[in-house]
């Protein structure tokens, strides 16, 4: 006969083994984790940093190890004042306080803006401050308030948005490095900037119209400039070239005359009488060849009656 007690003991042993294996499997499975391609995992052992893991399947030791997964390759962003649309700003004075900032000329401007950042050091991001996202938000608001306070409302709306956003980015990165938060601010954007309704908004609209008119006149002036100036420059260059040609011609003629004069002078110095006679003969020949009705009159002749005038 079967020993019931022995069978029970064997069954109990197998059951214990099965339960133990199941528990071990559950514990192992519970401590297996997957790190995504855009993430890194921080593993703490007894509360201290033990290792940092890249993407893949990993296992941690139960009870004594703890893991934190951080998205290090994703650009994250924090938005400010996006509850307000431009129509809300014009129609409602009860705008979101987060979007209202005092400018350097003591006006109030409503701004919709955002900060984009990436995590550079997962451990510093997770453990250097208690609430990193709130800290980043406070740093961003402080930097934006300071930069807005350095500009007038019209500079912010029309001219200097890029300067402000670059200044906020630089200021944030400097403060973040001092606090060792382990992030890099990638970009700061001002999506919308409008004054509240009232006289300031009306003045802003007037300025915008004036700026549009100014740009219109500038473009018209540039168009006329581009049409007229090249033509004038061409005419000026033509006159300059003609003057240069005339100058060269006069210089060359003067040099030629100088060479002729020097040759005559040399001949005269060698044979003055012969040279005088030759010059006289050449001059008379030129006169007689080119003139009509030449009359030769004796200088001692008196009471000369010009026959050519007698009719």
UniProtKB/Swiss-Prot annotation:
Gene3D superfamilies with a match to the protein in the record: Band 7 domain
GO cellular component, one term: membrane
Annotated TM spans: 15-35
Location within or outside the cell: Membrane
Keyword list, A-Z: Membrane, Transmembrane, Transmembrane helix
Origin superkingdom: Bacteria
Purpose: HflC and HflK could encode or regulate a protease.
PANTHER family: MODULATOR OF FTSH PROTEASE HFLK, STOMATIN-LIKE PROTEIN 2, MITOCHONDRIAL
Protein name listed in UniProt: Protein HflK
This protein's encoding gene: hflK
